[in-house]
Amino acid sequence: VTRTIDIPTYQTAVVRNCSPTLAGIKPASLFTYPGVYANQNGKPSAAHIEERRSRLLAVIAQCNCELQPLGIHMSVLVWRPCGALIYVYRPADLMRYLSDPRATTALAAEGYDVRNLPASLVHLAARITLASSNAAESAYDGSVCALARNRHCDTGCMCEFPHEIGYFLGYPYEDVHQFIVQHGENYKVFGAWKVYTNVEQALTTFDSYRACTQYLTYIYQQGCTLGQLVQATR
């Protein structure tokens, strides 16, 4: 699947996948924008890949011009043959969430310094890349995995997916911890994330995410810009 690289198509994908973050009820969202953004088996050409990346980055930059004054930023984490992995987040809200010891301690054990958000995102992108196919590339030039236990990694291996990504999406701390400890098994409810504790609150949150997405999709279709969507939900 390849998606057209233009402002309307991209913004529609953002609204569909990131409305809770636009509305301020979730610190971050992650989605894949379909298309070929990394070379696999020599196809397509490097020039074609670079051209597609440049076009998408230009679209994202234009959206950031509108959203950054409103406290929202978006960036590509990883380029893959199946699509670009795009992270949309509220830096202030995310830093507040990550400053909790339940996140800080767990992330420090995986090589993150959450006091430095840009560096943490570089590290996250590197770890996702290591866990992906050989064709995947971090969107951060020269980024490497900082974990001592991953020093054995080479171009022919695939490392375990960094499930600590749940912290970077603002999921409940204990649910992220239990997901990692229990390897994604034995959960009570599966919605926006796998729930291990406080099912009732999680179900309420799932409902709010759905309602938010429906509402923002509706007013976006009436002609609102992304910035207007953010302001409408303040």
What does each model-identified segment do?
Residues 18-23, 74-79, 125-127, 152-156:
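Short, flexible, solvent-exposed loop/turn segments with mixed acidic/basic and small polar residues
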Residues 122-169:
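A mid-sequence, solvent-exposed acidic-amphipathic segment
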Residues 159-189:
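Hydrophobic/aromatic-rich, well-ordered segments within soluble, folded domains that form packed cores
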Residues 108-111, 117-121, 125-126, 135, ...:
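Intrinsic low-complexity, intrinsically disordered or marginally ordered coil/linker segments
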Residues 39-53:
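Short, flexible/disordered intra-domain loops and linkers
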Residues 1-42:
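Short, extreme N-terminal leader segments that mark the start of a protein/domain
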Residues 50-119:
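A glycine-rich, hydrophobic loop/mini-helix early in the fold
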Residues 192-234:
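Long, compositionally biased
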